[in-house]
C-alpha cells in the first residue's frame, strides 16, 4: 500500500506513535488497512457547503465499514455569489489553485492510499479535480448537491440568477420594494449549490460523465436521503477501487474530456466549465485544442435548457431522469460520446447509464426534438480573440444569430456597471470590459453584475458584452467572455476604441472588430504596457504566473526558472 511509506518498518515507529495519538486507529492491526483521506470543503459562509460536515461523517462511517481508516482534512472555499461585484471576486478563480495545492500537499505528505473528495461550489470542485489529476491516487467525488429552487409570491420559480436580475429590475422600477425583498428572502430556501445550471452544478454534472462520480451526483438534492446514501455508496466504491488500483488518470482521458464537453453542450452549462475542463486536461497531461470544442458542439444536440436559460431547476432535471437520462439519450446518436470508457464505478459509461430513459420531455428533450441541433456553448475566434473566446449560446435569445454594434469601452468591471446603471449604455452598444482577465483582474472576475443589469433593464436583445473576464453560470444574454489573449498580455481587445463596430457572428463562430489591420497596428504602437494591480500577497504571485483563459487560466512557472 502507498501508506506503508509512513507506517511500516522500525524506522517509522515515531510516525506510528503519532498516528495512534489521532484516535483514528483502534488497534495495531489497523496499520494494515488502507488510509483514506476525506478532502472536505465544509465552510459556514457558503450555503453549498454548510452541510458537508454531516456528509463527511457519513463517509467516515462507511469507509470504516468497508475496512479502511478515514482521515478528514479541509480546504478553503469562496462563495462567488457573496464575493461578486467587489474586490473579493479577485480571489475566486485563484482559490482553485490554492485548493489544488493544499489537497496535493496533504495527500502526498501523508501518503494516503485513496481520497474521498467532497466539493460542491464553483471553484472547489475543479480545484479538487486538479489535485486528483496531480496526485493520481485512487479517488472518488461526491458533491454536496444542489439546493431547492425558491418560490416567489407569484408562484414563480426562483434561483440566485433571479435575484441578480431583480437588482436591475428594481433599479429600473419594474418591480416594487416589497416584491424585491420577498425575492431576497425566498430565492435560496435550503443548503446546497445554487439551484440552476450555474458553474457548481455544471461541474458536478460533468463529474458524472468524466467518470469520477456516481450517477446522479449532479442533480440529487443536498437535503435528500439519496444524497446521503450516495455518499455511503461512493465510500464503499472508493475502498474497492483502492484494492483494484483504479486511478483518476486511468479514467480522465482525452475521450473523457470530449464527453465532458458533449454533456456541457447538451445541458447548456456554464462557460466556466470550459475554463476548468481545459485546466483539468492540462493537469492530466492532455494537450487539448479549443477548436475541438466547436467540433463537439456541432455534433451534440442541446437537450436540456435549465435556469438561468429557462425556469427549470436542477431538481426538475433530476425528476426528469437526471444526467443518466441525458447521457443515455446522447448514446443513441453514434459518435456523440465514447461510452465504453471505464469509470469510477468499475463499469463503463455505457453500463452506468444505458436504459435510463427520460421521464419528462418538457425538461429533457429527445434527440428527435432538441432545443437546437447544436450544443449550448461556442468558441469564437477572430481579430479580437485570436486564441478564442466563449459564449453560452444557450443563454442567447434564439432569434439572434449575429449582433453588430458600437463599442463602448471600460477598463474595469466597476466602470462598466456604473455606465449601465446611469444609462450611458444604450441599445446598439457592445460593452467592452477589459483588463479583467486572469492576469489583469487579477483573478478573472465574473461579470454577472453588468450582464444582469443589462437583462434587468430589458436590454438583453439589444446590448452585447465582451470581456477578457469571465461570467457566472447565472449569466444570460449576448455575453462573450474568456477573450484570449487578455488585454493585460497585450491581446487585441486592448486595441478597441469607443465607436468601433464589432460583429458577433454565432453561426460562423467569429468575433471581430471591423477595423483594418493597419489601424490596429498603429494603435498597438501607442499601447501602454500593463502594470500589475496587486503588488503583494498571493494575488501578486498569481499575476506573475497565471496564463490566459485559452489554457484554462492555470499557473505556470516560466521555463527559464525551472
Swiss-Prot record:
Its EC number(s): 4.2.1.9
Gene Ontology annotations of biological process type: isoleucine biosynthetic process; L-valine biosynthetic process
A GO-annotated cellular component: cytosol
Active site: 472 (proton acceptor)
UniProt keyword list: 2Fe-2S, Amino-acid biosynthesis, Branched-chain amino acid biosynthesis, Iron, Iron-sulfur, Lyase, Magnesium, Metal-binding
Top-level enzyme category: lyase
Pfam families: ILV_EDD_C, ILVD_EDD_N
Single GO term (MF): 2 iron, 2 sulfur cluster binding
Pathway in which this enzyme or protein is active: Amino-acid biosynthesis; L-isoleucine biosynthesis; L-isoleucine from 2-oxobutanoate: step 3/4; Amino-acid biosynthesis; L-valine biosynthesis; L-valine from pyruvate: step 3/4
Annotated SUPFAM superfamilies: IlvD/EDD N-terminal domain-like, LeuD/IlvD-like
Names of required cofactors: [2Fe-2S] cluster; Mg(2+)
Source taxon at top rank: Bacteria
Note on how the cofactor is bound: Binds 1 [2Fe-2S] cluster per subunit. This cluster acts as a Lewis acid cofactor.
Binding site for [2Fe-2S] cluster: 121, 194
Catalytic activity as recorded in UniProt: (2R)-2,3-dihydroxy-3-methylbutanoate = 3-methyl-2-oxobutanoate + H2O; (2R,3R)-2,3-dihydroxy-3-methylpentanoate = (S)-3-methyl-2-oxopentanoate + H2O
Binding sites annotated in the UniProt record for Mg(2+): 80, 122-123, 446
Xref: Gene3D superfamilies: IlvD/EDD C-terminal domain-like (3.50.30.80)
Function field: Functions in the biosynthesis of branched-chain amino acids. Catalyzes the dehydration of (2R,3R)-2,3-dihydroxy-3-methylpentanoate (2,3-dihydroxy-3-methylvalerate) into 2-oxo-3-methylpentanoate (2-oxo-3-methylvalerate) and of (2R)-2,3-dihydroxy-3-methylbutanoate (2,3-dihydroxyisovalerate) into 2-oxo-3-methylbutanoate (2-oxoisovalerate), the penultimate precursor to L-isoleucine and L-valine, respectively.
Oligomer and partners: Homodimer.
NCBIfam families found in the cross-reference section: ilvD, PRK00911.1
Family affiliation: Belongs to the IlvD/Edd family.
Name of the featured protein: Dihydroxy-acid dehydratase
The gene coding this protein: ilvD
Amino acid at each position: 500500500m502507498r501508506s506503508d511509506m509512513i507506517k511500516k518498518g522500525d524506522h517509522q515507529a515515531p510516525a506510528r506513535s503519532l498516528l495512534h495519538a489521532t484516535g483514528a486507529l483502534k488497534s495495531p492491526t489497523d496499520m494494515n488497512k488502507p488510509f483514506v483521506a476525506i478532502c472536505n470543503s465544509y465552510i459556514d459562509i457558503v450555503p453549498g457547503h454548510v452541510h458537508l460536515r454531516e456528509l463527511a461523517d457519513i463517509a467516515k462511517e462507511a469507509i470504516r465499514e468497508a475496512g479502511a481508516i478515514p482521515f478528514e482534512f479541509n480546504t478553503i472555499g469562496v462563495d462567488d455569489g457573496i464575493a461578486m461585484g467587489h474586490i473579493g471576486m479577485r480571489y475566486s478563480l485563484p482559490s482553485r489553485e490554492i485548493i489544488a495545492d493544499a489537497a496535493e500537499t496533504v495527500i502526498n505528505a501523508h501518503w494516503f492510499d485513496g481520497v474521498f473528495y467532497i466539493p460542491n461550489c464553483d471553484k472547489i470542485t475543479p480545484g479538487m479535480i486538479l489535485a486528483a489529476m496531480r496526485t493520481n491516487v485512487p479517488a472518488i467525488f461526491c458533491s454536496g448537491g444542489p439546493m431547492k429552487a425558491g418560490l416567489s409570491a407569484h408562484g414563480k420559480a426562483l434561483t440566485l440568477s433571479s435575484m441578480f436580475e431583480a437588482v436591475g429590475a428594481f433599479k429600473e422600477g419594474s418591480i416594487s420594494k416589497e416584491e424585491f425583498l420577498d425575492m431576497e428572502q425566498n430565492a435560496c430556501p435550503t443548503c446546497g449549490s445554487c439551484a440552476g445550471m450555474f458553474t457548481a452544478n455544471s461541474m458536478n454534472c460533468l463529474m458524472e460523465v468524466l467518470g469520477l462520480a456516481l450517477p446522479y451526483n449532479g442533480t440529487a438534492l443536498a437535503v435528500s436521503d439519496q444524497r446521503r446514501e450516495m455518499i455511503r455508496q461512493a465510500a464503499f466504491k472508493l475502498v474497492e477501487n483502492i484494492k483494484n488500483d483504479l486511478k483518476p488518470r486511468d479514467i480522465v482521458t482525452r475521450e473523457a474530456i470530449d464527453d465532458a464537453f458533449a454533456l456541457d453542450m447538451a445541458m447548456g452549462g456554464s462557460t466556466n466549465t470550459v475554463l476548468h475542463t481545459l485546466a483539468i486536461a492540462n493537469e492530466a497531461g492532455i494537450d487539448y485544442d479549443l477548436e475541438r470544442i466547436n467540433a463537439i458542439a456541432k455534433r451534440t444536440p442541446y437537450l436540456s435548457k435549465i435556469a438561468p436559460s429557462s425556469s427549470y431547476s436542477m431538481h426538475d432535471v433530476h425528476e426528469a431522469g437526471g444526467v443518466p437520462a441525458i447521457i443515455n439519450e446522447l448514446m443513441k446518436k453514434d459518435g456523440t460520446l465514447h461510452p465504453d470508457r471505464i469509470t469510477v464505478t468499475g463499469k463503463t459509461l455505457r453500463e452506468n447509464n444505458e436504459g435510463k430513459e427520460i421521464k419528462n420531455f418538457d425538461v429533457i428533450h429527445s434527440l428527435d426534438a432538441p432545443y437546437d441541433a447544436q450544443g449550448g456553448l461556442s468558441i469564437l475566434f477572430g481579430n479580437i480573440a485570436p486564441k478564442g473566446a466563449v459564449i453560452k449560446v444557450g443563454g442567447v435569445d434564439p432569434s439572434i444569430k449575429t449582433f453588430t454594434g458600437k463599442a463602448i469601452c471600460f477598463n474595469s468591471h466597476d466602470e462598466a456597471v456604473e455606465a449601465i446603471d446611469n444609462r450611458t449604455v444604450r441599445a446598439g452598444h457592445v460593452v467592452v470590459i477589459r483588463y479583467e482577465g486572469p492576469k489583469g483582474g487579477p483573478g478573472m472576475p465574473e461579470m454577472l453584475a453588468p450582464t444582469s443589469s443589462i437583462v434587468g433593464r430589458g436590454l438583453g436583445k439589444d446590448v452585447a458584452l465582451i470581456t477578457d473576464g469571465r461570467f457566472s453560470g447565472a449569466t444570460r444574454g449576448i455575453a462573450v467572455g474568456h477573450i484570449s489573449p487578455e488585454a493585460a498580455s497585450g491581446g487585441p481587445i486592448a486595441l478597441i476604441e469607443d465607436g468601433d463596430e464589432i460583429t458577433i457572428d454565432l453561426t460562423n463562430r467569429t468575433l471581430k472588430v471591423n477595423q483594418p489591420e493597419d489601424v490596429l497596428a498603429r494603435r498597438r504602437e501607442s499601447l501602454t504596457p500593463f502594470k500589475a494591480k496587486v503588488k503583494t500577497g498571493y494575488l501578486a504571485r498569481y499575476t506573475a504566473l497565471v496564463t490566459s483563459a485559452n489554457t484554462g487560466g492555470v499557473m505556470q512557472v516560466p521555463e527559464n526558472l525551472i
